């Protein structure tokens, strides 16, 4: 579960290293984001000489959470970290590579481009 003020790792090569969630997008006043949800975040740590700088406000999709994701067959999927991929307004990733595994549920959330770039889909 990602809420406001939560820190996330960045799972792509867009230039950011750490994000802080400042808003969870969706209907109503949502408090938490799960895998596949879009958040508004601020870049807290960035790689020098890249196109994303510190204190930039970006949109990101959550790809990994430490809280378990329960599937219909009863399996619970837990990751070691909270991570997100930075996306543009159309929902395409801004980076060209994605690091680490992502959940299969992203394909159902219309993030097929993110799933296709991922090295491992669980």
From Swiss-Prot:
Keywords attached to this Swiss-Prot or TrEMBL record, sorted alphabetically, are: Chloroplast, Plastid, Ribonucleoprotein, Ribosomal protein, RNA-binding, rRNA-binding
Known HAMAP family for this protein? Ribosomal_uL14
Function comment = Binds to 23S rRNA.
Any one of the GO CC terms:
cytosolic large ribosomal subunit
Q: Which InterPro entries match?
A: Ribosomal_uL14, Ribosomal_uL14_bac-type, Ribosomal_uL14_CS, Ribosomal_uL14_sf
Broad class of where this protein is predominantly found: plastid
Instruction: Please give one Gene Ontology molecular function term for this protein.
Output: large ribosomal subunit rRNA binding
* Keyword Chloroplast tagged: yes
- Could you confirm whether the keyword S-adenosyl-L-methionine appears in this record? no
Question: Under which name does UniProt file this protein?
Answer: Large ribosomal subunit protein uL14c
- What is its quaternary makeup? Part of the 50S ribosomal subunit.
Name the family.
Belongs to the universal ribosomal protein uL14 family.
As for subcellular location, the record says: Plastid, Chloroplast
Gene Ontology terms describing biological process: translation
């Amino acid at each position: 579960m990602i809420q406001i003020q939560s820190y996330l790792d960045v799972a792509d090569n867009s230039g950011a290293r750490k994000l802080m969630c400042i808003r969870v997008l969706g209907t109503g006043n949502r408090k938490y984001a799960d895998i596949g949800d879009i958040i508004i975040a601020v870049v807290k740590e960035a790689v020098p000489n890249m196109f994303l700088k510190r204190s930039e406000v970006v949109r990101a999709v959550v790809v990994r959470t430490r809280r378990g994701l329960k599937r219909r067959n009863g399996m619970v999927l837990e990751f070691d970290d909270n991570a997100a991929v930075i996306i543009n307004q159309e929902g395409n990733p801004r980076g060209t590579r994605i690091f680490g595994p992502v959940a299969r549920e992203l394909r159902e959330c219309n993030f097929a481009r993110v799933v296709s770039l991922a090295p491992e889909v669980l």
